[in-house]
A protein has these predicted regions:
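Short Cys/His-rich Zn2+-coordinating modules
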Residues: 9-16, 38-60, 71
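Conserved phosphate/pyrophosphate-binding and hydrolysis machinery centered on Walker-type P-loop NTPases
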Residues: 3, 21, 40, 53, ...
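Extended, structured, electrostatic nucleic-acid-contact surfaces
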Residues: 1-21
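Extended interfacial segments that mediate partner engagement and assembly in macromolecular machines
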Residues: 28, 79-145
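Conserved nucleotide-binding/hydrolysis micro-motifs of P-loop NTPases
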Residues: 68, 81, 93-96, 115-118, ...
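Long C-terminal interaction/binding lobes of large macromolecular proteins
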Residues: 39, 102, 133-205
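Cys/His-rich short segments
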Residues: 49-96
Length: 205
């Protein structure tokens, strides 16, 4: 009933904000009202940033990390000071940010693009696994840290990859982040100290 007293444009914004992960209806209302009260310049800046998301953000064809549209490859991949023979395998691009904040990892990354989840219609064929095998060969990768989330889907993906790579005859040492990360917690939400300990205590598979 209360929606009927709000302007249509404001309701549309509330609905759009409310569709974002982790944004409750009440939070969406607060955000929308804040934007309404903000200056035109701030609103236009936000709108411009949103409009440029799909035109100025690209994906690295090797690591599948997010890059600027005018870049060819990820800076973390082309940085010669980083060890290309050590690869951390993550589900999503934001997981890279979480691991980088620890300051403990000097290898490179490979983004799977998700985790195996039959209920969501995500199978191995939807993930960047063939490209991973190609990277292992081309960069002579010696260790693969499987840093998928500590969730049912993340664990299933880790087990699948271990068996898949072994069956494919891919010779690479595989390890898994230590159990410092609570079950059910996504990598991007883990604190830096916990992630640092998880990296240091990773176990061979």
């Amino acid at each position: 009933m209360h929606r009927q007293i709000l302007p249509t444009a404001l309701l549309r914004l509330i609905d759009e904000l409310g569709s974002l992960p982790g944004v409750s209806p009440r939070t969406a209302e607060r955000y929308a009202y804040h934007l309404l009260r903000a200056s035109d310049k701030k609103s236009h800046t936000l709108a411009d940033s949103l409009a440029k998301l799909h035109t100025q953000v690209s994906t690295c064809p090797i690591t599948f990390a997010l890059i600027d549209f005018d870049e060819q490859y990820s800076k973390l991949y082309t940085d010669e000071s980083r060890n290309k023979q050590l690869v951390a395998l993550v589900e999503e691009p934001l997981d890279i940010v979480a691991l980088e904040k620890t300051g403990q990892f000097n290898g490179t990354y490979h983004v799977l693009g998700g985790a195996i989840s039959p209920i969501d219609g995500v199978g191995p064929e939807q993930l960047h696994i063939p490209e991973l095998i190609e990277r292992i060969k081309n960069d002579t990768v010696t260790e693969l840290i499987i840093a998928t989330n500590a969730s049912v889907e993340g664990e299933s993906t880790a087990l699948f990859l271990q068996k898949y790579l072994q069956d494919a005859g891919v010779e690479v040492e595989m390890s898994r982040l230590a159990r410092g990360i609570p079950v059910g917690v996504d990598l991007e939400y883990a604190d830096q100290i916990t992630l640092s300990h998880a990296l240091d205590g990773r176990r061979k598979l």
